Amino acid sequence: MEWNYLYNHFDPVAFDLWGLKVHWYGIAYVLALLVALWVAKWIAKKDAYPLSNEQLESYFIWVEVGVILGARLGYILFYDPFTAYYLTHPWQIFNPFQNGEFIGIRGMSYHGAVIGFLIASFLFAQRHGVKFWMLMDLVGISVPLGYVFGRIGNFLNQELIGRVTEVPWGIYVAGVLRHPSQLYEAFLEGIVLFVILYAWRSRVKFTGQLGIMYLILYALARFVAEFWREPDAQIGYLVGGVTMGQLLSLAMAIPCLVLWGYLAKKERGKIL
């Protein structure tokens, strides 16, 4: 079986469970969460974070709810062409059925997930008396490896496809050779970010630096990866050939840079 024709021989459905189709994407998503939690526990123990495994497990449940809500709502607001419909029919936003058939919840936005994650993290920190910025540092270094599985899930689900190409490692999608952009993102936004953040741990100057650094680096990696990724059909290219993903990444990076400067200045003030 040739790599270029992988999709012709691959079924995105892993197996049926009592009539319910379980997709490889769903399995990859669960693995992403478990890997991120495992890395968080490992780093928390290695770097002596004042958090127990029970607290981390509880925190990840909060975060998972926030991520799902934020990702879905973010997609509706940023990408979906039927935003007005969903705003007037909010009960349809999380409806996993279509014409009586279970199709799961489709349409998620990373940038919306970040917003949901931040809100859930803030509420958890307030509820349990945990430092918010400490959580950001821990998550910033634990998310990237889990993210790798998320993008692999996108690849197996044949979604978020790449742009048309002639490179020998391209993959045919509906008869058209395209970049396997999901795998590029898994490498850039996952593996590369983890290596950088892991190495930076010993150089941290203020609490929250790793968390903010992750968002800035992700925005940069995503901006670059978008040049290989096909823009959403319902949106296409924006002004100057920029994609919605690139625009949202810039919108995320700019306030993060400002926040970095503010927290760094605040820390220097403590030292002086």
From Swiss-Prot:
Protein origin, superkingdom: Bacteria
UniProt-listed Enzyme Commission number(s): 2.5.1.145
Function comment: Catalyzes the transfer of the diacylglyceryl group from phosphatidylglycerol to the sulfhydryl group of the N-terminal cysteine of a prolipoprotein, the first step in the formation of mature lipoproteins.
Pathway(s) this gene product operates in, as recorded in its UniProt entry: Protein modification; lipoprotein biosynthesis (diacylglyceryl transfer)
GO cellular component: plasma membrane
Primary localisation category: membrane
Membrane topology term: Multi-pass membrane protein
Protein name according to UniProt: Phosphatidylglycerol--prolipoprotein diacylglyceryl transferase
Cell membrane recorded as keyword: yes
Transmembrane domains' residue ranges: 24-44, 59-79, 102-122, 129-149, 180-200, 208-228, 244-264
Pfam families linked: LGT (PF01790)
